[in-house]
UniProtKB/Swiss-Prot annotation:
Protein name: Sugar fermentation stimulation protein homolog
Similarity annotation: Belongs to the SfsA family.
Gene Ontology molecular function: DNA binding
Lineage: Bacteria, Pseudomonadati, Bdellovibrionota, Bdellovibrionia, Bdellovibrionales
InterPro entries found in the cross-reference section: SfsA, SfsA_C, SfsA_N
Pfam families: SfsA, SfsA_N
PANTHER family: SUGAR FERMENTATION STIMULATION PROTEIN A
This protein's encoding gene: sfsA
């Protein structure tokens, strides 16, 4: 995913009312939209460098969007929750159906022939992606989760209690019982982690459900994102699990 123009760099001053951030930029204070409902627990540190995008849409109330904050370890941390789905969608469309060309972390996606985004499984629920083979009525369902939290070199999810995330795990287990396969892609929007674990201290029920689903065959894929001021890409680096 390429940004429309190179991100601007400033100093993160504060986040408030969840969706607003003040940034020092070229000697002035500007306000940016924060596209993240989580706590941003490990990067909500005033004084850190940050990167933000600028919209050319004249109807937007805030023309700036906070995209990344530099962590105390020196890693850029992506905070835009829309980024992971875009990056995974681009990767899937590049990989699916190209069986002979794909190796490594994405190889299991190449076995499928079609990508169906925002796949409706009930009146109330859509999952991020469904992958389909031409000769099968069974699907591979994918739900994408954004990861910003890290503690002692371990990426963790969630950074706040997520009843929606719990619901998705129950639904994925139900789909697996019907003979489908399922996967959660945890997109690690930082480079300073060597493993992934559920954040049991924040949402113990999510951790319990994730382990149950994993034991029942859920594929858990913590992919690291490559973050730069020009683009964000899904790397083939899959972190080891600490379950």
């Amino acid at each position: 995913m390429k940004f429309h123009s190179k991100l601007q760099e400033g100093i993160f001053l504060k986040r408030y009312k969840r969706f607003f951030a003040d940034i020092e930029f070229q000697g002035q204070q500007v306000t940016a939209h924060v596209p993240n409902t989580g706590s941003l627990k490990s990067v909500n540190n005033p004084g850190q460098h940050c990167l933000f995008s600028e919209s050319t849409n004249p109807e937007r109330k805030l023309k700036y969007t906070l995209e990344m904050i530099k962590s105390p370890t020196g890693s850029w941390v992506g905070v835009n929750t829309a980024t992971p789905n875009t990056v995974v969608r681009e990767t899937l469309h590049h990989v699916v159906g190209h069986k002979k060309e794909v190796i490594g972390g994405f190889a299991h996606w190449a076995a499928f022939d079609e990508v169906k985004p925002e796949y409706k499984i009930s009146a109330e629920t859509r999952l991020d992606f469904a992958l389909k083979k031409n000769n099968s009525d069974k699907m591979h369902f994918i739900e994408v989760k954004n990861v910003t939290l890290a503690e002692e070199g371990t990426a963790k999810f969630p950074d706040a209690v997520t009843e929606r995330g719990q619901k998705h795990l129950r639904e994925l287990m139900a789909l697996m019982e019907q003979g489908h396969t399922a996967e959660i892609v945890f997109t690690i929007q930082r480079h300073d982690c060597g493993s992934f674990s559920p954040a049991d201290d924040i949402d113990p029920e999510y951790g319990r459900l994730l382990r149950e689903a994993y034991q029942k065959g859920l594929r858990v894929s913590p992919f690291v994102l490559d973050l730069t001021p020009e683009s964000v890409e899904l790397s083939e680096t899959v972190l080891p699990l600490k379950m």
